[in-house]
Every structure is written in structure tokens, then in C-alpha cells.
Amino acid sequence: MTKRLSPQLLIYGYAQGIFPMDEDGQIYWYDPDPRAIIPLDERFHVSSSLQRTIRRQTFEIRFDTAFRETMQACSERDETWISQEFIEIYSQLHAGGLAHSVEAWQDGEMVGGLYGVGLAGLFAGESMWSKARDASKVALVALVERLRAGGFQLLDTQFITPHLATFGAYEIPRAEYKQLLVKALQCSATF
């Protein structure tokens, strides 16, 4: 348990393979076993219906234009681990070029997106939101394309969900995750 967060503490945590969540005003650090990742190779799967949505260009995808708003939207649920303190600290990481958002826009309005932390060749996906069908899914596909182009090695999703499994996300033992993390932190990548 931690009382306060700082950008430096967050970066240290991600480099060790742990991540924070706020529960009832207390900050806890997690190191799940197993750990979920999304493959950045040919195992990443996009359904044919989602491919059609992407081809129709239903959404305009933007990167890092509404980071704070993306986090705020991710936090607006009945139960959330994203406190205002988290929004402030991650926004500081964003200002330093280490946290990023992918936003789906439609008719001038942001209708979905995601955010996460990029550290060397690691991208730790933190949360997604959507108020238009497929908006966050299209944002995830755009994220994977960007990570591939930038030389990222590891897309950490922390926990598996049925939604992420449709893209090919899978679980690996903590020890294997730590090995992949060490390799990812040794490479240079650009978001």
C-alpha cells in the first residue's frame, strides 16, 4: 500500500512489472500471476466485422490530443480504480511524453478511446472506454499498429477480459512476463 503517487514512483513500478490501483482512497500495487498481454505479431486478431468498420472510417483516430479527457471518461463508471489523484499523476507522465491516449472521434466529439504508459519497448494499457459501438475497439487496433511501427515489444493489459481475448490477448505466468519485460525495457521504441 502507498499513500501518495509520483511520476517517478509510477515509472519505477512499471519497470518492476507492478502497477497501482486506487481502492477506497488507498493505493495498492499489483503484480498478477498470470499476467495478460496482447500479441504485437500476427497473433493479434481483428474480426472481419471490425475490419469493415475500420475500412468505413467511421471514426477519426487521434493520438495524445485529449489525454486528460480520455482518463476522465475511463473513470466515469459505477466502480473505478481511477481517482482524481491518478488523473493528475498520469497527466504529468503524459506531459513528460510517457503516457499516451488513443482517441476515437466522430462528428467532432470524442466517443471512445484508451490510455496507457509507454516505457522503452513496453506499453502498459491501463483502461478503455466507449460510448459509440466499436469506438474503443478501433482505438485498440490503431494502438497496436502504432506500437508495431514504433518498435514496441510488449503490450501489457494486466488482466484478461473476454473483450481483449477476442483480439488474441492471452495469459502468461508472472515469471515469463518478467522475462519479456526485461527485454522490452532494453529496446528503444517511439510512440
Curated annotation (Swiss-Prot):
It catalyses: N-terminal L-lysyl-[protein] + L-leucyl-tRNA(Leu) = N-terminal L-leucyl-L-lysyl-[protein] + tRNA(Leu) + H(+); N-terminal L-arginyl-[protein] + L-leucyl-tRNA(Leu) = N-terminal L-leucyl-L-arginyl-[protein] + tRNA(Leu) + H(+); L-phenylalanyl-tRNA(Phe) + an N-terminal L-alpha-aminoacyl-[protein] = an N-terminal L-phenylalanyl-L-alpha-aminoacyl-[protein] + tRNA(Phe). Its EC number is 2.3.2.6. The keyword Transferase applies. It is found in: Cytoplasm. GO terms for cellular component: cytoplasm. One of its GO terms (molecular function) is leucyl-tRNA--protein transferase activity. GO terms for biological process: protein catabolic process. The keyword Disulfide bond does not apply. It holds the Pfam family Leu_Phe_trans. Keywords: Acyltransferase, Cytoplasm, Transferase. It is an enzyme of class 2 (transferase). InterPro entries: Acyl_CoA_acyltransferase, Leu/Phe-tRNA_Trfase, Leu/Phe-tRNA_Trfase_C, Leu/Phe-tRNA_Trfase_N. Belongs to the L/F-transferase family. Functions in the N-end rule pathway of protein degradation where it conjugates Leu, Phe and, less efficiently, Met from aminoacyl-tRNAs to the N-termini of proteins containing an N-terminal arginine or lysine. This is Leucyl/phenylalanyl-tRNA--protein transferase. It comes from Herpetosiphon aurantiacus (strain ATCC 23779 / DSM 785 / 114-95). The gene is aat.
